[in-house]
Amino acid sequence: MPIHEIRHPLIRHKLGLMRRADISTKSFRELAQEVGALLTYEATKDLPLENYRIEGWCGPVEVEKIAGKKITVVPILRAGIGMLDGVLRLIPNAKVSVVGLSRDEETLVAHTYVEKLVGEIDQRLALIVDPMLATGGSMAATVDMLKKAGCKEIRALVLVAAPEGIRLLERTHPDVTIYTAAIDQRLNENGYIIPGLGDAGDKVFGTKQKPS
């Protein structure tokens, strides 16, 4: 399974700011969008192009455009919403599918409560966005949904990934490409990534954070 840890200086700098224990909701939200945009740049570098002609200021000119590639962005609720605006800033015409998953805090198993996929999913490149790839359960479940609906090309954009989550995706969906700002050390006994970012959903929405 291809996994790309994007070690661009801007990403490393912004991720370092996000790791601060005292970061404000506003700052975390803005940085999540910015890193999401930078990951989108990396995840779309190989999209095919085609030539076409336009009328320029000095006459006809040949330019390029993305070759008819339909894209859907798939935020995993609720934390994935924190990255969505950053992704759409670069691909504003992309359709948005929504998947809602909640994790049982004892078993760490993900349960689906929302599944709203756009039409023609079988013809689209799906970009799943979720700040944390921890156990990998939510990501694997989302990929399952997309494949069941006919989606054939899936990429995942995450801020931080744990080795445990990567291994699960390698076993269950080796054809999915992952783009991450960092591969961290491990999960703790509660399923939180170490050193991680804390609870990304709580930090995006400003709700009370659970102890890790």
Curated annotation (Swiss-Prot):
Entry similarity comment: Belongs to the UPRTase family.
Catalysed transformations (reactions): UMP + diphosphate = 5-phospho-alpha-D-ribose 1-diphosphate + uracil
Highest taxon in the source lineage: Bacteria
Cited Pfam families: UPRTase
InterPro entries the UniProt entry points to: PRibTrfase_dom, PRTase-like, Upp_B, UPRTase/APRTase, Ura_phspho_trans
CDD domains documented for this protein: PRTases_typeI (cd06223)
Keywords tagged on the record: Allosteric enzyme, Glycosyltransferase, GTP-binding, Magnesium, Nucleotide-binding, Transferase
Requisite cofactors: Mg(2+)
Coiled-coil parts of chain: none
Protein name per the record: Uracil phosphoribosyltransferase
Species this protein is from: Azotobacter vinelandii (strain DJ / ATCC BAA-1303)
Cofactor note: Binds 1 Mg(2+) ion per subunit. The magnesium is bound as Mg-PRPP.
